């Protein structure tokens, strides 16, 4: 189904519409992929998007983790290749990664892709945040689809077009057997008429996307500099969010100031003190920095008063 939408996506991506599958958000496609493949064993680096593991365990799959280390900047290392073995059915990679925003070098992805093909492993690469990178064309694996039938790319409208809640994502692969199997396990009419219309209209908005990208580049630079000035340890995110390490009570401090930030301590492989903030308008970003500055100052003053009282007691 959804022929006009699939045709519009195919034209936008420069692929055949037979290679496109649409989903109720990229998350639905992750689940239908797992239901279709029924993997026994899968590999994911952590921290990463939690839905991969959720989808894998929902179909009884055993999940192996490769820990991305703080001292290595949470980037995927060459040693990841050594974790690939013939018992694996699937590997999930997110580029750039969520929540860290750290990208994976394309040459390295080629190596992973080749080894996966040799070992008959399906490689799923989530490119939902790729459009926020300065040169997305240098990172996408789209050109490899025709040669590698073990490759599945995930994309979403949510991030690129600020369409959260409309629920529209898509996948691209030249593995027709896989697409047929996914269609079998996907409920019919999974995409509303409104989501289809919004998707077709959004794909024509090239100027809006470029404008949004430029704003993200500009504001991400501002946020990174300001967060560093506040003493936070900022990681080199290439997405439309910033990942950093700060005081363990920063979430509560911000809430008191009327600002919500994402506490990342519930991500597998992360401890307390890691946060992710979205890159928003300049005014909102200023408000965030102000809330952090005022909040941490207040907290420091209160802490000093407690120490003073303890000394006097």
Predicted segments with their positions:
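PLP-dependent aminotransferase-like
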Residues: 3, 28, 35-93
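PLP-dependent aminotransferase class I/II
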Residues: 1-3, 150-235
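Short loop-beta-helix segment that forms the pyridoxal 5′-phosphate
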Residues: 10-32
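Conserved PLP-binding catalytic core of the aspartate aminotransferase-like
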Residues: 217, 225-258
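Active-site phosphate-binding strand-loop segment of PLP-dependent enzymes
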Residues: 64, 71-133
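PLP-dependent enzyme catalytic core of the Aspartate aminotransferase-like
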Residues: 107, 256, 266-313
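Helix C-cap/helix->beta junction micro-motif
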Residues: 59, 118-119, 148, 230, ...
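Short acidic capping loops at alpha-helix termini that bridge into adjacent secondary structure
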Residues: 16-20, 127, 149-150, 312
């Amino acid at each position: 189904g959804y022929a006009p939408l699939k045709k519009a996506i195919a034209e936008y991506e420069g692929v055949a519409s037979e290679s496109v599958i649409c989903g109720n958000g990229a998350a639905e496609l992750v689940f239908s992929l797992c239901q279709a493949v029924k993997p026994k064993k899968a590999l994911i680096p952590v921290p990463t998007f939690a839905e991969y593991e959720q989808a894998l365990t929902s179909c009884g799959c055993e999940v192996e983790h490769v820990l991305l280390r703080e001292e290595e900047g949470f980037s995927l290392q060459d040693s990841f290749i050594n974790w690939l073995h013939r018992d694996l059915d699937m590997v999930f990679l997110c580029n750039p990664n969520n929540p860290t925003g750290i990208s994976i070098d394309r040459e390295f992805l080629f190596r992973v892709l080749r080894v996966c093909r040799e070992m008959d492993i399906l490689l799923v690469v989530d490119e939902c945040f790729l459009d926020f990178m300065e040169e997305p064309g240098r990172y996408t694996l789209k050109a490899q689809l025709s040669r590698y039938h073990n490759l599945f790319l995930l994309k979403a409208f949510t991030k690129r077009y600020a369409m959260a809640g409309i629920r529209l994502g898509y996948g691209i692969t030249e593995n027709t057997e896989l697409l047929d199997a996914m269609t079998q396990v996907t409920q019919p009419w999974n995409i509303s008429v409104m989501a289809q219309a919004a998707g077709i209209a959004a794909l024509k908005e090239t100027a809006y996307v470029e404008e949004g990208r430029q704003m993200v580049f500009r504001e991400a630079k501002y946020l990174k500099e300001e967060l560093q000035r506040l003493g936070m340890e900022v990681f080199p995110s290439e997405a439309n969010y910033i990942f950093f390490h700060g005081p363990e009570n920063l979430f509560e401090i911000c809430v008191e100031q009327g600002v919500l930030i994402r506490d990342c301590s519930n991500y597998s492989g992360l401890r307390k003190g890691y946060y992710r903030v979205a890159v928003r308008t300049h005014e909102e970003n200023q408000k965030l920095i102000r809330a952090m500055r005022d909040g941490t100052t207040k907290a420091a003053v209160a802490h000093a008063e407690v120490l003073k009282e303890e000394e006097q007691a």
